[in-house]
Amino acid sequence: MIKTLLVDDEPLALDMMKSLLREHSDVAIAGAHTSASKALRAIQDLGPDLLFLDIQMPGMSGFDLISKIQAERMPHVVFATAYDSFAVDAFDVHAVDYLLKPIDPSRLAQSLQRVRDQRSAKANTAFDHRDNDRKSHMMTALDGLHGVQPKFLDPKPGN
């Protein structure tokens, strides 16, 4: 499941996004917030996998919110906004995608597939690192055995 958090200052936009995301069985909506500051606390508490984020919000913009998230807690981010002028900035902060409102269901499906692909690649990379760590430990252990002469038990009793 993709644990998802929605952030938009417009309740109607949140409702629309919830409705669209319900069509995707692997997406679990963990929360929806109209305030970026409340969303920041939810990100810290819930650790979502995915964040759908509006850009222009009162008090704190979507970009401001992103800048306050610790790197190790950074979810995948898809910006959902009515303004196309922020697209380059969105990709500068490594957003997975940038959706224009009103959100087209097929574009949303493409965004979710990108998220799935990135999650899969990240999981494979983590597995590769764990596998490499195990190999390294085994090689260190084998190196420690290099030059050790095996001792055999003498089958004759008393020796």
Residue ranges and their predicted role:
Residues 4, 29-30, 77:
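Hydrophobic/aromatic residues located in beta-strands of well-ordered beta-sheets
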Residues 26-34, 42:
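Short hydrophobic/Thr-rich beta-strand motif most characteristic of the beta2 strand and flanking loop
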Residues 1-12, 17, 21:
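Conserved acidic segment of CheY-like receiver
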Residues 1, 74, 148-149:
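A structure-centric signal for secondary-structure junctions around beta-strands
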Residues 12, 22, 37-130, 134:
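CheY-like receiver
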Residues 7-8, 33, 51:
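Conserved sequence signature across two-component system core domains
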Residues 116-159:
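Conserved binding/recognition cores within well-folded domains
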